[in-house]
Amino acid sequence: MARDFSRAQRVSQEMQKEIAIILQREVKDPRIGMATVSGVEISRDLAYAKVFVTFLNLSAGEESDEEMVENGLKALNEAAGFIRSLLGKAMRLRVVPELTFAYDNSLVEGMRMSNLVSNVVKDDEKRRHKEEE
């Protein structure tokens, strides 16, 4: 019977859970704020992992948000060794992957798209209401 998921996919899912727990409970850097792990891409040999994070305390597209993201990513990449050591204790792997953190803007982009759609719907309702009068 064939497996539906490769080992790398299973490891990346487990890493996502464990890193989220580590960020929530162990990392105390205020620059990180409310970071969530949205995904993990891992190399086939399990040597490198790219961790995608989002920051929940951002508003839609402000200048200060970009600075907060840069500071948060810098703090996460500086703490990558510490997070990797805790990850090694939490997971049973022969080699714990080297971690790099990247910002996942899909949440902010989704909020922006949702706002655009709701604005178009409001405008359409206003036009329809004016035509009825």
Curated annotation (Swiss-Prot):
Set out the biological process GO terms recorded for this chain's protein: maturation of SSU-rRNA
Where does this polypeptide localize? Cytoplasm
Gene3D superfamilies reported in the protein's UniProt record = 3.30.300.20
Which superkingdom is the protein from?
Answer: Bacteria
Keywords in UniProt for this one?
A: Cytoplasm, Ribosome biogenesis
Q: Name one GO cellular component term.
A: cytosol
Gene Ontology terms, MF aspect: ribosomal small subunit binding
Pfam families in the record: RBFA
PROSITE patterns the UniProt entry points to: RBFA
Q: Which PANTHER family match?
A: RIBOSOME-BINDING FACTOR A, CHLOROPLASTIC-RELATED
Q: Which family does it belong to?
A: Belongs to the RbfA family.
Q: How does it assemble?
A: Monomer. Binds 30S ribosomal subunits, but not 50S ribosomal subunits or 70S ribosomes.
Q: What does this protein do?
A: One of several proteins that assist in the late maturation steps of the functional core of the 30S ribosomal subunit. Associates with free 30S ribosomal subunits (but not with 30S subunits that are part of 70S ribosomes or polysomes). Required for efficient processing of 16S rRNA. May interact with the 5'-terminal helix region of 16S rRNA.
* Protein name listed in UniProt: Ribosome-binding factor A
| Species for this entry | Proteus mirabilis (strain HI4320)
